């Protein structure tokens, strides 16, 4: 069988195959013969115009694979596919050397880690700023080629990071600039070039807590009087003491030091008691009405004078039946759900109840 006369041979043999085989088997057999002969012809003449039919072969195969250049199941694993396509697409890996990759790829180290590596590799464990620049440029070609301001970043890290200490130059040592050394307490923070910032934050937080504890211990001795106990750290005024004795608030000592917060929480406590009183019997409402009014008086000064006006306005409704006032009050209580609205609805019930009893 000659590969040159292959199309004419397929055209002559196609009717015979179509009579004895179904259409799917005919296409599979013809495609297999065409692929084998095309691979032989493709090894001899590798031109760009002949690559298009080879991509089309993969489309007609049953398990289609979009990655045709990887020699998957969708393409026949012939030597021509592995040598021509894979070799040309991935040939840049053989050209690029390790040094060229290092010039392109940025090293996975922070500027603080680069400074620490430079100082640790120095014989005397100290370097000047120019020597740190030289170490980074010599060991990492990316920074030698790049001009993105990495020297400014290194200079800022030296001045802002507490792990790097500035050492003045000796008088007998000629040259410019001071030396930079690494703090011995921070040597464990650098693990294989990676700077562990979490440990530094924990040490700073522990030292800050120790300073605050010392300040609190010395505060009573400086500002406290001789007759006061050392446990009393927050000052108290006579107004706050009278308010706490009269209302018996359960708020903590740190909150009661502010008069505004004291009045606010006492009014909120009175609002909570009114929500409980709403669920009690109507016979106890008259006894608790004065407490509710005094609780609202701490919240605002105008809320005490308003019920007297409501009493005069509600005098017109005293002749209503008791069951009608009860139904209207039940509807009002179901309409409002918050503590603020419950307080005023309970007060309106109080006045309506007093009018019905009279």
From Swiss-Prot:
Family annotation (InterPro entries): Fork_head_dom, FOX_domain-containing, TF_fork_head_CS_1, TF_fork_head_CS_2, WH-like_DNA-bd_sf, WH_DNA-bd_sf
Region of interest: Disordered: 1-25, 191-255
Start-end of Polar residues biased regions: 1-13
Protein encoded by which gene: foxi1c
GO cellular component: nucleus
Primary residence: nucleus
Annotated GO MF terms: DNA-binding transcription factor activity; sequence-specific DNA binding
Biological-process GO terms, alphabetical: positive regulation of DNA-templated transcription
DNA-binding region: 106-200
Protein name: Forkhead box protein I1c
PROSITE patterns: FORK_HEAD_1, FORK_HEAD_2, FORK_HEAD_3
Localization: Nucleus
Record flagged with keyword DNA-binding: yes
SUPFAM superfamilies for the chain: Winged helix' DNA-binding domain (SSF46785)
Biological function: Probable transcription factor.
Record's keyword terms, sorted: DNA-binding, Nucleus, Transcription, Transcription regulation
Organism (species): Xenopus tropicalis (Western clawed frog)
């Amino acid at each position: 069988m000659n590969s040159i006369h292959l199309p004419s041979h397929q055209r002559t043999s196609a009717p015979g195959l179509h009579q004895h085989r179904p259409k799917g088997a005919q296409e599979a057999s013809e495609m297999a013969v065409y692929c084998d002969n095309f691979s032989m012809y493709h090894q001899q003449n590798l031109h760009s115009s002949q690559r298009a039919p080879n991509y089309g072969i993969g489309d007609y195969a049953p398990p289609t694979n979009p990655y045709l250049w990887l020699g998957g199941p969708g393409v026949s694993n012939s030597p021509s596919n592995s040598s021509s396509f894979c070799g040309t697409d991935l040939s840049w890996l053989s050209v690029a050397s390790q040094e060229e990759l290092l010039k392109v790829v940025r090293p996975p180290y922070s500027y603080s880690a680069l400074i620490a590596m430079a100082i640790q590799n120095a014989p005397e464990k100290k370097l000047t700023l120019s020597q740190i620049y030289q170490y980074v440029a010599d060991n990492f070609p990316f920074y030698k080629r790049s001009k993105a301001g990495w020297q400014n970043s290194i200079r800022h890290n030296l001045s802002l990071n507490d792990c790097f200490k500035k050492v003045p130059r000796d008088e007998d040592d000629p040259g410019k600039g001071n030396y930079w050394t690494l703090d011995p307490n921070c040597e464990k923070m650098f693990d294989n070039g990676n700077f562990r910032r979490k440990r530094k934050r924990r040490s700073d937080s522990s030292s800050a807590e120790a300073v605050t504890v010392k300040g609190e211990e010395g505060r009573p001795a400086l500002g406290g009087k001789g007759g006061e106990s050392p446990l009393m750290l927050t000052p108290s005024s006579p107004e706050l003491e009278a308010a706490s004795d009269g209302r018996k608030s359960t708020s903590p000592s740190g909150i009661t030091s502010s008069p505004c917060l004291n009045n606010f929480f006492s009014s909120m406590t009175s609002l909570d008691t009114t929500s409980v009183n709403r669920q009690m019997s109507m016979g106890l409402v008259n006894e608790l009405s004065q407490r509710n009014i005094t609780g609202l008086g701490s919240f605002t000064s105008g809320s005490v004078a308003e019920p007297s006006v409501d009493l005069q306005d509600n005098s017109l409704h005293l002749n209503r039946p008791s069951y009608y006032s009860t139904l209207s009050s039940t509807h009002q209580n179901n309409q409002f759900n918050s503590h603020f609205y419950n307080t005023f609805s309970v007060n309106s019930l109080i006045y309506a109840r007093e009018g019905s009893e009279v």
